[in-house]
């Protein structure tokens, strides 16, 4: 296995400016918000990895089981896959399962890992180093920038398979999901594939435990966003003055994560040139996790320029893997 990655000093400098600009913009909205991608610094990625191991958060285990069971069929249906692009690399364990279960049809391979977290990229590359005849290229950047980079590169022979797992599609609202899926489609040629993992609608009590676990790991993950603002942008958030809340919005079919102020307070964020007055109970909306029905997933993908090749559903744990091809 070989691993390649470009120097990211300028990328990180631009990312710091973008972080400050986004904090300035989103914290002045009504309701106050922060983009969920900023949850995933090194500590945030480690905390999310811990969340995925909790008994109440079944997405990771269910998806891994399904990838192992259906990986060979994914590659059989596409045929001649030479390049895999994983958007959101995680720890690499699920992609490793997919590639291993698809052997021997998937060698040699070039795998492009796209993630904003350098820690996640390093972890994923380490996991995938166990694979033979695989070259790994790291892209420490946003999904959109990574897709643009790949679209500008010469294409090798064979098909390209984009992989977007972990129900990360659920972090987009409907217009955002459509725009993102169309961006993926633009980076693919006719017949290339996209494998999408998406969580299905579940009972409210199951979702509540998944997003507000009794051990407080998800709460720490959410509050770490304030830790990051304090550290990187010169903020003075009092971490004990905000509490994690997870709310099931049935009308919108989404779980919402918020940070709620437990008392009135004024927060200064120097790098964002921002002073924010929080009243008791006022919330910062940090993440949405939309849940779907199987038919909604297919319709969403077809609207973005794909045709369904296969869909596998776990009816017990309520999760779907959908394989589509660019049309």
Language-model features, listed with the residues they occupy:
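A short, conserved alpha-helix within the catalytic core of class I
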Residues: 171-183
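N-terminal auxiliary segments of SAM/dcSAM-dependent transferases
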Residues: 1-38, 45
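Substrate-binding/catalytic lobe of Class I Rossmann-like enzymes that use SAM or dcSAM, i.e.
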Residues: 208-290, 294, 298-304
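Class I SAM-dependent methyltransferase Rossmann-like catalytic core
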Residues: 31-78
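Conserved SAM/SAH-binding beta-strand->alpha-helix loop
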Residues: 114-119
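Conserved SAM-binding loop of SAM-dependent methyltransferases across substrates and taxa
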Residues: 91-106
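Conserved class I S-adenosyl-L-methionine
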Residues: 81-90
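Conserved beta-strand signature within the Rossmann-like core of class I S-adenosyl-L-methionine
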Residues: 186-201
């Amino acid at each position: 296995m070989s691993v390649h990655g470009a120097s990211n000093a300028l990328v990180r400098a631009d990312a710091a400016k973008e972080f400050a600009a986004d904090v300035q913009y989103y914290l002045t909205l009504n309701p106050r918000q922060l983009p969920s991608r900023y949850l995933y610094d090194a500590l945030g990625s480690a905390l999310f990895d811990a969340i995925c191991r909790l008994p109440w958060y079944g997405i990771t285990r269910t998806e891994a089981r399904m990838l192992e069971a259906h990986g060979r069929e994914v590659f059989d249906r596409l045929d001649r896959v030479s390049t895999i692009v994983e958007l959101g690399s995680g720890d690499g364990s699920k992609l490793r399962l997919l590639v291993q279960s698809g052997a021997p049809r998937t060698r040699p391979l070039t795998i492009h890992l796209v993630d904003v977290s350098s820690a996640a990229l390093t972890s994923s590359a380490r996991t995938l180093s166990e694979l033979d005849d695989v070259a790994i290229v790291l892209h420490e950047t946003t999904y959109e920038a990574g897709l643009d980079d790949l679209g500008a590169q010469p294409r090798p022979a064979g098909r390209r398979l984009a992989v977007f797992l972990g129900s990360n599609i659920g972090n987009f609202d409907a217009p955002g999901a459509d725009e993102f899926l169309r961006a993926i489609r633009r980076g693919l040629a006719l017949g290339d594939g996209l494998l999408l993992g998406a969580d299905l609608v579940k009972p409210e009590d199951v979702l509540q435990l998944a997003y507000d676990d009794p051990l407080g790991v998800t709460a720490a993950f959410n509050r770490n966003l304030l830790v990051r603002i304090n550290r990187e942008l010169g903020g003075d958030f009092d971490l004990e003055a905000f509490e994690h809340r997870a709310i099931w919005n049935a009308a919108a079919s989404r779980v919402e994560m918020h940070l709620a102020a437990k008392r009135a307070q004024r927060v200064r964020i120097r790098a964002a040139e921002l002073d924010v007055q929080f009243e008791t109970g006022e919330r910062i909306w940090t993440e949405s996790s939309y849940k779907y029905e199987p038919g909604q997933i297919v319709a969403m993908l077809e609207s973005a320029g794909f045709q369904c090749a296969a869909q596998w559903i776990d009816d017990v744990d309520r999760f779907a893997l959908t394989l589509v091809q660019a049309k």
